[in-house]
Amino acid sequence: MTGTPPPGQARVQTRITVPDPQIMVNLLGAGDEILRLVEQSLASDVHVRGNEITITGVPSDNAVAERLFSELLELIAKGETLTTDAVRRTVGMLAQGGSERPADVLTLNILSRRGRTIRPKTLGQKRYVDAIDAHTIVFGIGPAGTGKTYLAMAKAVQALQAKQVNRIILTRPAVEAGERLGFLPGTLYEKIDPYLRPLYDALHDMLDPDSIPKLMAAGTIEVAPLAYMRGRTLNDAFIILDEAQNTTAEQMKMFLTRLGFGSRIVVTGDITQVDLPGGTSSGLRTVRDILTGLDDVHFAQLSSTDVVRHRLVSDIVDAYARWDADREAQQNQGVHAVQGRTAQGGRANRRR
């Protein structure tokens, strides 16, 4: 991507030598697809000849290009085959700044099973995972597709396998049923299964499916609606509350006070997707005001830059955020206008 240099800055050349032909093949990608994506991402021009990469641009742009190539070469050195997704993630992380190296973020293994590795894919996800390691209670708040629940469950399985905890407890509010499961037909399992199915699906990604029924029968893994947490003290457990935006303030307090010795809690949710009845305030909204600043409690905020689903999902999240902000601004203007007319009417009445 060629740009006009800023006034007073001359374009210069920077060269990077890649001594191993196989590394260069990986760096360029099949049909040069990686190279084309890199060129689109940079303000400097990039040309490759033999084992040499020539970067042409103003010094500041060249420095960005050098950093990008350095990270991509580090990924290759760590045994990775470059993909367009890895390049986009690296470009995004470099644009955000921060002290973390993208190559380190993208190669941080949480769990591996049958050749599939679960890793953070963004800076926000890496910081979220680090917070889970460092704090007893962590809130993961962000839009759909940011890996809030999936990464929390991966950390729970990792902790169980490392014998840091004795059991995993997964819960979510069955708000669609009003948590009045007794009014639904069928056994308890049949009643709660539709609401907890996403948690089972994630478990099947992380554990041998044949072992899951045995672990559940032994109480090592428990999946239950939030209402079933009341009155318990949960020791030596990794506890995850999913869809926490659909808890009331009272339910959130009840859940957090289940914490026992040797346990950790991760609470996940998206405050833009509240399904509670009108007028009911979300416990996930209020808990931040109540617990911010409390020792050993951390709030991790994920955003559209952390979405790891289809690239359109990130754009959709941003579009809805803009729409919500515009609607809120219009509502506020309407309130101010009504207040202004009311005040003027009051003054007119007093003059009469």
Write out the residue ranges for each language-model feature:
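N-terminal intrinsically disordered, cationic/polar leader segments
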Residues: 2-3
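Short glycine-/aliphatic-rich beta-strand segments at the starts of folded cytosolic domains
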Residues: 7-26
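Short amphipathic alpha-helix segments
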Residues: 23-40
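N-terminal assembly/transducer modules of large multi-domain enzymes
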Residues: 40-42, 49
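Interdomain "pre-motor" coupling segment immediately N-terminal to P-loop NTPase/helicase cores
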Residues: 47-105
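Conserved helicase motor core of SF1/SF2 NTP-dependent helicases
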Residues: 52, 114-125, 134-241, 245-352
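Conserved adenine-nucleotide phosphate-binding loops and their immediately adjacent elements
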Residues: 105-117
